[in-house]
Amino acid sequence: GYKTQTVEVGGRTSFNIVLVEEATAVDEVVVVGYGQVKKSDLTGSVASVKAEKLTDIPANSIDGLLQGRVAGVQVVNSSQDPGASSTVRIRGNSSLNGSNAPLVVIDGFPWGDAGDLKQINPQDIVSMEVLKDASASAIYGSRGANGVILITTRKAQENVTRITLRQQTTISGFSSELNLWRDPVLMAMLSNESSINAGLTPIYIGATNANGVYYPSIAELQTTWTTNTRWDDLVFRPTPVSNNTTVQVQSSNDRTMFQASANYYLDNGMYIEDTYRKYGGNFSVEHKLLDNLRMKASANIPSIKRHNNGGLAYWRNPIFPVYDDNGDYWLYGAQDYSHPLALTDLQKNDSKGLDIISFASVNWDVLPCLNVMAQFNYKHGEQITDKYFPKKYSETGVFNDGYGSIDNWKDDNIVFEAYATFDRTFAEKHRLTVMGGYSYENYQSRSSSLAAKGFINESLGNENLAAGDSETYSIGNGSYKTELVSALTRINYTFDNRFLFTFTARADGSSKFGSNNKWAFFPSGAFSWKMHEERFIRNLNVFDVLKIRASYGISGNQGISAYQTLSRYGQHKYFNGGKWVTAIGPGYQSGYTGQDGIYALWSGIPNKGLKWETTAQVDLGLDMSFFGNRLNVTFDWYDKRTSDLLRERNIAPSSGYDKMWVNDGEIRNRGIELTIDGVAFQNRDWRVGGTFVFSRNRNK
């Protein structure tokens, strides 16, 4: 945008006016739940990350784009495995056993929790909004209890045809040389000294141990011993390379906008043969049926292939060779639990996944002040995991004479939503926006697993589970279904563009709870005062924006598995004492006590009194802008309390049960958030600026 300028006419008839760009678009449109508002009209705590900032640093995942960008949002990389998901939290953990992940909404579609972000190509993203306080997220009810991340993807521009190729290559490496043993002599000396100090017999004495493995003496290591294997050089990639390639086609005319893209992402892990591949296709079309009637449809289809290699180079003793005299992998005794190259070649740990996410909507401007929106979303996911661990080698130290398994699951999620929005200004100073809607969600999941041990022939691995010992066969399957029905409303009132009020309410009914607690009501309210619109503030000539905010709201959490309020009855068959034993009882068998696994514990005990977790949150905020919006400051203080925590409680074994779900306990999160964003210099070609983000959360 450009700055507003005032020029005195006087007696002049011609003027030279130079457009000056605004450093920050204060009145840019920000996406909120079930609608859009101007940034200056926000009453809740909403952080926006636009396209120009998303391209500042390369990232192969959306959680990588969020990391360090938004105050109060914590992104933790818990694993360095290729394709691994990060843990995303907004203002701390609010639940012990329920979900703590924020809801992700893409182009209006409730996608899932933040663990699904890896399915989305970050190069398709235009902007992200993070709803942090209850007044902003309560409109999503139980699904928004942990905050909401709203993502807007790329769309075609009007009357433009464009083909875009984006290529991103990332080269990784260890920041320093791994701290592994390089000197076998020093290693042996320290090992012997440690054993002696502990009252044990040292092993580096030139003798063969109980496993038949010869450990040389220190004198041998100093003179005649020649084996000093650099396991890290054999197992680790020196410079893992990742590539993310996207081809996008956009086209439009006066009535239709079309966009399609194809993506290939390859992430090579630190270990050899450790890879993650993602193939993705995405398209969207928006068509104006009439001047006041629009339809939109889109689909996103990511396919994932994962080949997992655990490595274990840091476990391996450098005095051990890679191969024996016959050219086979060297064995530590009869069985070996840490030979990294043998595990790389002989074990199997692969997974394949496919997701189909589709979206369709109709948008009707019934009147200039009344809009009706209906949308249908369907998401299908499936995955199969193949594993085989050979007889002689294991990365866990547990040997089953060969172990193979096949696990698969699939789920289907259907969401239908319809809402109407009334927006009108009365007597120039009074603006009223009212939204009311309905939401229905149906989720179904099904899984199955096959496993066997004791393989006679390993040539086909888990492709021939019948080669395993029939007495070790394990077969399991399960399915469940949940439904969520909701009614929602939001009322925004603005007086004289200075005082803004927001009220939201949502009623959720979940099939996970019993009849007495099935429904929950989640209200919120917020107030904002644009002090910079007051004359006494304008006369100071200091603030471009000075706004205070206050909000309070309640949200809920239904993050438990299905059927915990219902009595369940199941059968479990297991091999014990040389024979098959069938256990029949309430639910499923979850554990044993006593010798030989004779005593079964069950987890089918219902709790019909289970109810929603509820989170109440208060937020106080301050927004300021200076120097023609070149310096922007946002500060928030919040206090968030979650009560009636959903958690599993242990039960006395004498009852025959293991655990049951209860409402018990409270969690409190308090904190402050500060964001300072500044632009030192900006013209048509250059922009020099920076962002400072600080947040502090205390959890109790």
Predicted regions and their residues:
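Short aromatic-centered micro-motifs
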Residues: V104, V322-Y323, Y493
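Extracellular/periplasmic, surface-exposed regions of secreted and cell-surface proteins
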Residues: L54, A59, N100-A101, S284-L293, ...
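Short clusters of small/polar residues that mark proteolytic maturation junctions
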Residues: E8-V9, G115, L312, A334, ...
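Detector for glycine-centered tight turns/loop "hinges" at secondary-structure junctions
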Residues: N326-Y329, E428-K429
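Short, small/polar-rich motifs associated with maturation and membrane association
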Residues: G1-N282, R294-K296, I357, W612, ...
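Extracytoplasmic gating/loop element in the C-terminal half of outer-membrane beta-barrel translocons
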Residues: I203, A219-L221, T396, D469-S470, ...
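Short, conserved phosphate-binding/catalytic loop or strand-edge motifs used
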Residues: A84, R277, K391-G397
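Low-complexity intrinsically disordered tracts that form flexible linkers/tails across taxa
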Residues: R306-I319
